[in-house]
Amino acid sequence: MNIEKSTMLSTALANFDRVCSLLGDEYSPDLLQKLRYPKERSELRLSPQFSDGRIHTIHAFIVHHSDAIGPCKGGIRMSPTVTLDDVTALAMEMTWKCALIGVPFGGGKSGIVADPLTLSPDDKQTLIRSFTRNARRNIHPLVYVPAPDMGTNERDMGYIKDTISYSLGYATTQGSYVTGKPVIMGGIPGRREATGRGVVLSTMEALSTLGGSIKGARVIVQGFGNVGAGAAETFAEMGAKVIGVSDVDEAIYDEKGLNVVALLEHVRKTGSLRGAGQGRVVSHDAILEMPCDVLAPCATADQITVKNAAKIQAKIIAEGANGPTSTEADAILAQRGLYVIPDILCNAGGVFVSYLEYTQETQQEQMTREEVLARLDKRMKDKFKLVHDTATTRKLHTREAAMYLAVRNVCAAHIARGALP
């Protein structure tokens, strides 16, 4: 298979190729080569009829990267710029993330080429239901279990669950076809904030490891969507000083600290950080280069590049987004001695709580928010320690250590299944 390399995919492949050199003596080249490519890539042509009366043609993609450990798991991204290669990279990253955090899932991802900001609520529902009908053979509790991602939310997951359940003649809350749903439909309390909270928990461990504390730590959060806003809120609750935030419209900075609660309320009312009335407005490039203890890129891929890696003044990079650091920039950060919490560890809180949702729905139980967060806290701390100790023992950078552990787990699953001799 000849995969055209996008920036996101080239970064994912470079991270994988780097760890293959560490695993070459443990596993066969054929097995490692197998993991370099997805199991299945599907392109869909959706034909929803929107409220304007027209039938629109919209492209969508589904990628199943690996199901060696369990059914594929990964969100549905809705964006006018998402590509098949992007979805392939994200599915591959989900394989490593699930293997590292220790949940019985493989990696998958979906992409819908549409701008959610230009769709009315009714048209978005129509599009999501059209996607579900066309993707029906791909979505199943034992095949691929979607979740929210950029441009989609828990309401959309409810539409997916309802569409499938209705077609099967099941009650809406029967069958774990999707996670990240509304709690009333079988979702789990704590899922919405799980990814952002995981970012903060791993950062707390990193600060402690380096002899610091979350109390008073100066934090900049890039991105103010579900992950970034959740992380900023939790950072503030834990005693950190959030001195900078940004979204697609505006970046603001105040070395004395921002009122995160007020920012969240402003965004809830207006949908944007613009006009928040706090701090001073800076450029989106500048916010990444301001002095701080922790920089949490929680927006999109390739935000830390060769152009700014040498200018970043943070001590810790907490990768709340998927693939926010390019391969070349990663080498610069490592050379400078910055502590990077890699994305497959840092933002794994979401898929861990999705696993809890999957299991509780299968068993027809209901966990409390306190139970969910307690289990999340322990898992993030345990896996951070494992990655840090592996990096120290094997003299690896943290990303290499995380990838080493993840890929080794997937290889072990393949061998246990007898997929290859």
Regions found by a protein language model. Give the residues of each.
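Glycine-rich, N-terminal phosphate-binding loop and its surrounding beta-alpha-beta segment
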Residues: L44-P116
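Short, Gly/Pro- and small/polar-rich lid/capping loops
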Residues: N2-R45
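Rossmann-like adenosine-cofactor binding region
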Residues: E250-V340
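Flexible, glycine/charged-enriched surface loops at secondary-structure junctions
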Residues: E26-L32, G102, H140-P148, T172-Q174, ...
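Glycine-rich phosphate/diphosphate-binding loop of Rossmann-like nucleotide-binding domains
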Residues: K181-P182, G186-E289
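Glycine/serine-rich phosphate-binding loop and adjoining beta1-alpha1 elements at the start
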Residues: A99-K215
